[in-house]
Amino acid sequence: MTTQRRKVELDPDTVERDLARLVLTVVELLRQLMERQALRRVEGGDLTEEQEERIGLTLMLLEDRMELLRTRFGLEPEDLNLDLGPLGPLL
């Protein structure tokens, strides 16, 4: 009986971009979750004005950095929205 080995085929020309896409997708998911949590806290009145300002600036900075990284790897925002099949899109 012979066992058939499965090989993972990787394209060396796109492996860096594909890895960047995966990592940036996870970071974008976390960024969106943090943004939603911050909005809930602001709407709930849980934060001081200074905290609101700091969170807002931090989220804006993170969004800017994400844009720079997407540009560096030739990715568009929609490239980070993975299709999860029957579950629908990730983001």
UniProtKB/Swiss-Prot annotation:
Belongs to the gas vesicle GvpK family. Induction: Gas vesicle production is induced by growth conditions that promote production of secondary metabolites tiancimycin A and B. It comes from the Bacteria. GO terms for cellular component: gas vesicle. InterPro entries: GvpK. This is Gas vesicle protein K. GO terms for biological process: gas vesicle organization. The keyword Methyltransferase does not apply. It holds the Pfam family GvpK. Keywords: Gas vesicle. Its main location: other. PANTHER family: PROTEIN GVPK 1 (PTHR40137:SF2). It is found in: Gas vesicle. Might be involved in nucleating gas vesicle formation. Gas vesicles are hollow, gas filled proteinaceous nanostructures found in some microorganisms. It is not clear what function gas vesicles perform in soil bacteria. This strain probably produces some gas vesicles from the probable gvpO-gvpA-gvpF-gvpG-gvpJ-gvpL-gvpS-gvpK operon; it can be induced to produce more under certain growth conditions. The keyword Ribosomal protein does not apply.
